[in-house]
From Swiss-Prot:
Species per Swiss-Prot/TrEMBL record: Chlamydia trachomatis serovar L2 (strain ATCC VR-902B / DSM 19102 / 434/Bu)
EC number of this enzyme: 3.6.1.66
Official protein name in the record: dITP/XTP pyrophosphatase
Free-text remark on how the cofactor is bound: Binds 1 Mg(2+) ion per subunit.
Ligand binding (substrate): S7, S8, H9, G10, Y11, K12, S71, F154, G155, Y156, D157, K177, H182, R183
UniProt xrefs under PANTHER family: INOSINE TRIPHOSPHATE PYROPHOSPHATASE (PTHR11067:SF9), INOSINE TRIPHOSPHATE PYROPHOSPHATASE/HAM1 PROTEIN (PTHR11067)
Cofactor: Mg(2+)
BP-aspect Gene Ontology terms: nucleotide metabolic process; purine nucleoside triphosphate catabolic process
Length: 209
C-alpha cells in the first residue's frame, strides 16, 4: 500500500517511517522525494486545522493515503505564544535557531522568570485522496530551559524539558524521544486507523484476484 508522509523534514520522516514499518508492508515516500512540491500556507488556528490542511492538499495532489502532522508550543506565561506562530515566531524566513533565540528573549522579559511551564499540542492525521480523515491528538507538558542544550532533534527541542526528565528533547537519544514525544504519542493513537486502512487495502486486493 502506497502512503505519503506529508513532510520534507528528515527527523519527522524518519520517525513516521519507523512507526509505519512496524505496522505492515507499506510503499512509503515523503515530500523529500518531491523537492519541487509547494505545500499550502499554514493558516490554521490549531494543530488539527494545519495537519488536515496539509494532509488533504498532499493526498489530493498525489492521489494516495497521506499522514500529516502539526505541533504547537504553548507557554502560558507568554499568553500562549508561540502557539500558532510556532513555525514562524521570528518571521517567515527565519530558521529554527532564530525562533529559539526570540523565545528566550521573550522569556527573559517576563516579570516572573520562574514560571517556565510549557506544553506541546500535536495532531496527526491520516487522510485519503477522497477526503476521508482519521486524526489523533496528544500533548506533552514540561518547562523551557534557560539556554539551548543538546544537538539532536529540531525546532524547540533544545529548549523543551519534558516533565519527569532532566534532559531537553535535543539531549535525549532519538530512540527515546520517539517513544515519549507528543508526536510519538499521537502516532500510537493513530495506529488502529492505519491498521484498519491497511487491512481493507489488503482485503480489496485479494477480492480483485
Amino acid at each position: 500500500m502506497k502512503i505519503l508522509i506529508a513532510s520534507s523534514h528528515g527527523y519527522k520522516v524518519r520517525e513516521t517511517k519507523a512507526f509505519l514499518k512496524k505496522l505492515g508492508e507499506f510503499d512509503i515516500f515523503s515530500l523529500v522525494d518531491y523537492p519541487s512540491y509547494q505545500p499550502p500556507k499554514e493558516t490554521g488556528e490549531t494543530p488539527e486545522e494545519n495537519a488536515i490542511q496539509k494532509g488533504l492538499f498532499a493526498a489530493q495532489t498525489f492521489r494516495c493515503w497521506t499522514i500529516a502532522d502539526d505541533s504547537m508550543l504553548i507557554i502560558p506565561a507568554l499568553g500562549g505564544l508561540p502557539g500558532k506562530l510556532s513555525a514562524s515566531f521570528a518571521g517567515e524566513q527565519a530558521n529554527d535557531k532564530d525562533h529559539r533565540k526570540k523565545l528566550l528573549e521573550n522569556m527573559r522579559l517576563l516579570e516572573n522568570t520562574i514560571d517556565r511551564s510549557a506544553y506541546f499540542e500535536c495532531c496527526v492525521a491520516l487522510i485519503s485522496p477522497f477526503g476521508k480523515i482519521f486524526k489523533a491528538h496528544a500533548s506533552c507538558e514540561g518547562t523551557i530551559a534557560f539556554e539551548e542544550r543538546g544537538s539532536s532533534g529540531f525546532g524547540y527541542d533544545p529548549l523543551f524539558v519534558k516533565h519527569d526528565y532532566k534532559q531537553t528533547y535535543a539531549e535525549l537519544p532519538e530512540a527515546i524521544k520517539n517513544q515519549v514525544s507528543h508526536r510519538a504519542k499521537a502516532l500510537v493513537k493513530l495506529q488502529p486507523y492505519v491498521e484498519t486502512v491497511l487491512a481493507n487495502h489488503l482485503l480489496a486486493g485479494k477480492e480483485s484476484l
